């Protein structure tokens, strides 16, 4: 029962005090750094690179791989040895599945039982609200990832083995399957996928991998459980993803085709079918995959703006992708639409979205904006580059996309460290950083309501 205090303060004695969650964000960050730092040291060893790698470039590359971003300061295919490429594959897989998932797998393999706190952290990282068998859940996630990558491997091998031979063709197929499913964007070809702009098999295989990886296991698992019952029985998050993903893909494809079809440096020289294929691939890749089949440095300004918007929206929650997340964008959009219609509740698919979810979505957008603004300001101080390049590269790093407008290869030493921090924040999540800095202190006190002049 709510009680009123004489000084205008409400006390809520029957509400349970939420525990501060300052520890969880630190665990997430420490688990990330626990993989990152040793990996960076390994990449500096001669066995992993052809001509050596500085500690800064090694740290940048390791961060890009574990955060599944794909930005590179060196040519991945030419600079790294076979051992280095295998290490990058492992880092991409770890980054895509997440440190919590991989930690649980290793502990279960060695027969170690997770504590209740560890199980709670793992379930939160995997987006599970209901009680689930964590061991079974982790097994399903890993199985799904391996099966998806295996399917991609078969299709890409069919394309590349006849051209490159069994050993090289199969290795390239494996590397790019892992990179695509985990939305990492690392490619062994110097021009990314530009050599295959007219290749439907390669384009659709890679696009399929990063679309499924971007949906997330939560969505795939929900569809698998309820596909016979119908759309109505799906979780609201699944419904948002199943509608928003193809919608964003369609809008991006049409806009890229309209804006670039007459550009001789990108899609202008392609056939109509080739233009649509390139537009589709770029639209799918923009939301965190990081591959490009056309030269992005030659994109028109309007097309780059569309690319930036798609990168920022990103993929699904608990997926291998980044960005502010599709569901965050959808909730914020519907909250705005609800306000404009002067309604009291945010309703999606005949379900009322609870207020904490709405405020969390708005907080993610505000915190993300603050981080991006700060990073862009710092990069404009350290780099001699135009504002549009700085904006594109910063958002690409924050959304863990990996697409580049040409700035990454020219970054100064301070600029590289700024981008490293941005990639880390983008992968662990902006609110994780905010929780660590703000130190949440839940209170039982409720003050009287008042109005603030806005707008």
Curated annotation (Swiss-Prot):
GO cellular component, one term: plasma membrane
Intramembrane residue windows: 54-74, 169-189, 291-313, 390-410
Protein's UniProt keywords contain Transmembrane helix: yes
Regulation of its activity: K(+) transport is stimulated by Na(+).
Phenotype when changing residue 317 to C: Increases Vmax for K(+) transport
Entries under PANTHER family matching the protein: KTR SYSTEM POTASSIUM UPTAKE PROTEIN B (PTHR32024:SF1), TRK SYSTEM POTASSIUM UPTAKE PROTEIN TRKG-RELATED (PTHR32024)
Job of this protein: Part of the Na(+)-dependent high affinity K(+) uptake system KtrAB. KtrB is the K(+)-translocating subunit.
Protein name: Ktr system potassium uptake protein B
Native source organism of the sequence: Vibrio alginolyticus
């Amino acid at each position: 029962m709510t009680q009123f205090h004489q000084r205008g303060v409400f006390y809520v004695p029957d509400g349970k005090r939420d525990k501060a969650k300052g520890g969880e964000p630190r665990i997430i960050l420490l688990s990330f750094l626990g993989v990152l730092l040793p990996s960076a040291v390994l990449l500096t060893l001669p066995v992993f690179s052809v001509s050596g790698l500085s500690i800064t470039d090694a740290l940048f590359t390791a961060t890009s791989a574990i955060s599944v971003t794909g930005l590179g300061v060196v040519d991945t295919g030419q600079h790294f040895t076979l051992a280095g490429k295998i290490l990058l594959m492992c880092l991409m897989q770890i980054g895509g599945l997440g440190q919590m998932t991989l930690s649980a797998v290793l502990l279960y393999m060695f027969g170690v039982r997770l504590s209740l706190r560890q199980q709670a952290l793992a379930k939160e990282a995997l987006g599970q609200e209901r009680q689930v068998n964590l061991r079974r859940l982790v097994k399903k996630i890993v199985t799904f990832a391996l099966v998806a990558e295996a399917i991609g491997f078969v299709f890409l091998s069919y394309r590349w083995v006849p051209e490159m031979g069994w050993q090289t063709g199969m290795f390239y197929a494996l590397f790019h399957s892992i990179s695509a499913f985990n939305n990492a964007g690392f490619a062994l070809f110097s021009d990314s996928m530009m050599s295959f702009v007219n290749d439907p098999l390669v384009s659709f295989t890679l696009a399929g991998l990063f679309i499924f990886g971007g949906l997330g296991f939560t969505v795939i698992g929900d569809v698998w459980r309820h596909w016979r019952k119908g759309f109505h029985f799906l979780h609201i998050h699944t419904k948002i993803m199943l509608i928003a993903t193809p919608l964003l893909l369609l809008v991006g494809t049409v806009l890229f085709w309209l804006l670039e079809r007459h550009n001789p440096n990108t899609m202008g020289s392609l056939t109509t079918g080739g233009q649509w294929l390139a537009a589709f691939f770029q639209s799918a890749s923009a939301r965190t995959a990081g591959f490009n089949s056309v030269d992005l440095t030659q994109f028109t300004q309007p097309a780059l703006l569309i690319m930036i918007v798609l990168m920022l929206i990103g993929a699904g929650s608990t997926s291998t992708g980044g960005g502010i997340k599709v569901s965050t964008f959808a909730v914020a959009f519907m909250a705005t639409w609800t306000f404009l219609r002067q309604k009291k509740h945010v309703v999606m698919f005949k379900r009322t979205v609870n207020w904490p979810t709405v405020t969390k979505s708005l907080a993610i957008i505000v915190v993300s904006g603050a981080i991006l603004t700060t990073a862009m300001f710092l990069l404009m101080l350290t780099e001699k580059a135009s504002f549009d390049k700085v904006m594109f590269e910063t958002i690409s790093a924050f959304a863990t996309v990996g697409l580049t407008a040409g700035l990454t290869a020219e970054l100064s030493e301070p600029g590289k460290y700024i981008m490293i921090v941005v990639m880390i924040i983008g992968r662990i999540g902006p609110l994780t950083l905010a929780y660590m800095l703000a130190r949440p202190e839940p209170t039982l006190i409720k003050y009287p309501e008042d109005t603030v002049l806005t707008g």
